[in-house]
Amino acid sequence: RADYKVIPLINIGDTGEIKYKYAPKYIETFPHSIGWMLLRDYNCDGKKDVFYSASGGVMSVSKNISSIKLAFDLIDNKVSSDQYPGGDIGIYIPSADIPAIGYVDHDGDIDIITFGVLGTSLEYHRNYGMENHGTCDSLDYTLKNYCWGHFSEVGINTNKLVLKDTCNYNVPIPEGTTGGSGSSRHVGSTVTMFDNNGDSVMDLLLGDVTFDNVVMGLNGGTAPNTNSAMVSV
């Protein structure tokens, strides 16, 4: 990441075996000069598309158009979200951060969870592709919570989390409860969401460039977009 280069690794292992081989021939296929990159199938065609950081902290998406050869086509160089009260604004993600991109509400379109620009809490950008267009191939985002997970990071000297925190500022009727303070933090945080126990609400793994451990947050909610407060770490 320090050199903003893509390092392709192909799994050449047998079934059940993980064995990677460096494959430099694919380097030119991927976007250049990026801070982070995640492969996600946003349009449900079975091919992994590319979500990545572009210049200025905005997020871009390139669609996988491969047939015989691996190929991508830029479809959105500035993914935006309807953000209260500012309207449609590009989703800002520092190049040193890595957001979580996946299915928060399990409706088939890709959602985004990422740390806010200045805060220690997580923003939840919900994709309304299925609701508004009836298909998963739309990137139709709305900021539904400035403080998803009902927690905040303590500050720059520790990666501990404060649970049941109170959000100083949020969208009207936020989804997934409220939480998180507005204090500043350093960049270099990674967010991974996954369902640890199969209850359909997302738990979290949080990493930080300053610390050598990963913090796990367990979601005590029972339904996506209704109650998603972290109850233990």
Predicted ranges, named:
Residues R1-V233:
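Beta-propeller-forming repeat regions
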